[in-house]
Regions:
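Active-site beta-strand->loop->alpha-helix modules in alpha/beta enzyme cores, enriched
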Residues: 1-89, 214-215
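C-terminal accessory domains and tails appended to enzymatic cores
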Residues: 11, 27, 52, 57, ...
Length: 217
C-alpha cells in the first residue's frame, strides 16, 4: 500500500533500516506497544538512521507530524520525535494538520454514506488542529494524486466515491452538496465520514515564518 501511494504521489520512499525493521507500535497498552522492536521503543535508533539520510539529502524543508501525532497515534508521535531529534536546528519544519475550521465547514456540505455517520465534536477536535500557518491549494492533478494515494491505503482509508477495492468490496457514496468546495469524502475503519479537501494545511514547527512552504529558501 505504501509503495503504491508513493508511486501515485511521485515520491521516492526510503525505508529506515529496511522494510519491517521497525514494528508498528499499536496503541498504548497493547502488546504491540510493548514490543522491543516497536518504533516507540527505538526513537534514538530511528533518529540515527534518519539523520544520515537528511545529511545526504540536505533538505530545504521537512514535512512531518506535530507533537500530538495528528490524532494521537503513538507511531505518529514517535515520528515527530524522531524528526525533531534528527533534523538540523536550522532546517524549516512544517507539521501537516487537519485544519479544524476547514473540516467542520466541509462536513456541513456533505451527507454520510449509508451505514456511515458523521463524527462527534469530541472526535473532530481530537482529529483536527486549529490555526494553519500555510494553506496549499491543490491543482486538479495534485488532487487526483491525493485521491489515488489515499485509495492505495485500502486497509486504512475508504473513499466514499463509489469505488471498490479488494479490502472494501462494497461501494460507499457520500452526497456532496458543494463539490467545488469539498470534492470528496472518506472514512477510516470506524466509518466516520470526513471531507476530502482540495488543500493541505501546515503549522510551522521550526524555522523562520513564511507565507508558503519554501518561501525565502
Amino acid at each position: 500500500e505504501l509503495a503504491n501511494a508513493l508511486e501515485a504521489l511521485g515520491v521516492k520512499g526510503i525505508q529506515l533500516g529496511g522494510f519491517g525493521h521497525f514494528r508498528d507500535s499499536g496503541m498504548a497498552g497493547s502488546p504491540s506497544h510493548e514490543n522491543s522492536r516497536a518504533l516507540v521503543n527505538r526513537i534514538d535508533e530511528a533518529a540515527d538512521f534518519l539523520g544520515e539520510e537528511l545529511e545526504a539529502i540536505d533538505p530545504h524543508a521537512i514535512l512531518t507530524y506535530g507533537p500530538d501525532g495528528g490524532y494521537g497515534h503513538p507511531d505518529h508521535i514517535a515520528v515527530h520525535k524522531v524528526v525533531m531529534k534528527a533534523a538540523s536546528p536550522s532546517v524549516r519544519i512544517w507539521y501537516g494538520i487537519f485544519d479544524r475550521a476547514a473540516n467542520y465547514a466541509g462536513l456541513e456540505t456533505l451527507d454520510a454514506p449509508a451505514g456511515w455517520t458523521k463524527p462527534s465534536q469530541e472526535y473532530l477536535d481530537n482529529f483536527t488542529n486549529e490555526g494553519a500557518d500555510v494553506t496549499v491549494a491543490l491543482s486538479d492533478a495534485a488532487l487526483d494524486a491525493k485521491r489515488r494515494a489515499m485509495r492505495a491505503h485500502a486497509s486504512q482509508i475508504w473513499l466514499a466515491d463509489g469505488s471498490t477495492t479488494r479490502t472494501n468490496p462494497a461501494s460507499a457514496v457520500a452526497a456532496l452538496h458543494e463539490p467545488e468546495r469539498v470534492p470528496g469524502a472518506f472514512g477510516l475503519s470506524n466509518l466516520l465520514v470526513m471531507p476530502l479537501l482540495p488543500a493541505e494545511y501546515f503549522q510551522l514547527g521550526q524555522g523562520e515564518p513564511a507565507d508558503d512552504l519554501l518561501g525565502g529558501l
